[in-house]
A protein has these predicted regions:
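Conserved catalytic cores of very large enzyme subunits
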Residues: 1-255
């Protein structure tokens, strides 16, 4: 896996196009049985009402099922984008080809194999919002299942109301274990995600290169747009606010 910065040989290797998945959005869908509170639409599969869950494992399973559903959808979008690039004709990759000496010499665009190292033609998949997802899972595990200080009903209602009227619970969630502070409680959850999520996302093979896509775990400036698509989260984050930036940054103010 790579973070926000991918390393490539200058003017010799080209990384193919890719798409991103907002992991935190998938987790939000899992907490709402596949229903999106923001658009008021059933976007994902019905993975169970979390209010009826009796273990944290059920929460994780619901999230993984959402991911398994949306990964093929993302790949279909990728193929549609590629089809558009192909129908655009030879001009579609000309600007990029002008940056590669090998492409100029061979008269081929990077996607046609003009770059010196064609391995770079593989697609990439971006896994965004991993830190917020892990932090939110840790809050649920600690407060709902381990310590039983709140019910899932109370926590989900607090998120739906953007913590209004739930100020004490909001502070409890903000003070729950946060990734990046050397706390095994949440780091172990992130470790599981960083293993399981790539395994699910890389089940797909690029039909053009015949290779598994390269996985990026990051956000870059995308954390602002990602946050606008989200409601409040169990980690204490407010609705519409940015998610954690970069690849592995701690929640702002929590390191």
């Amino acid at each position: 896996a790579s973070g926000c910065l991918g390393y490539h040989l200058d003017c010799m290797e080209h990384l193919g196009g890719g798409h991103n998945i907002n992991q935190t959005k998938l987790f939000e869908l899992a907490l709402n049985n596949g229903f999106d509170p923001r658009t008021q639409k059933q976007l994902g599969p019905k993975t169970g009402d979390p209010r009826t869950f009796t273990s944290f494992d059920q929460v994780m399973d619901a999230y993984y099922k959402q991911l398994e559903y949306f990964v093929p959808v993302m790949h279909k979008v990728k193929m549609l984008s590629l089809a558009t690039e192909i129908t655009d004709g030879p001009m579609s990759g000309l600007r990029c080809a002008m940056q590669y000496e090998d492409c100029i010499r061979e008269g081929l665009t990077p996607k046609e194999g003009g770059a010196r190292y064609p391995e770079g033609r593989t697609s990439w998949l971006g896994s965004r919002g991993m830190v917020d997802t892990a932090d939110s899972m840790a809050a649920i595990k600690k407060l709902v299942f381990d310590e039983k200080k709140v019910t899932m009903e109370q926590l989900l209602d607090a998120c739906a109301k953007n913590w209004e009227g739930y100020e004490d619970l909001h502070q409890m969630c903000l003070n729950s274990p946060k990734y990046g502070n050397d706390e095994d409680y949440v780091d172990d959850i992130y470790d599981e995600l960083s293993t399981k999520v790539p395994e699910i996302m890389q089940r797909w093979i690029d039909p053009i290169t015949g290779k598994k896509p390269m996985l990026f775990i990051g956000a870059a400036a995308g954390h602002i747009a990602l946050g606008k698509a989200l409601g409040a989260l169990p980690n204490g984050r407010l609705a519409g606010s940015p998610t954690c930036d970069a690849a592995c940054s701690v929640m702002p103010g929590m390191d």
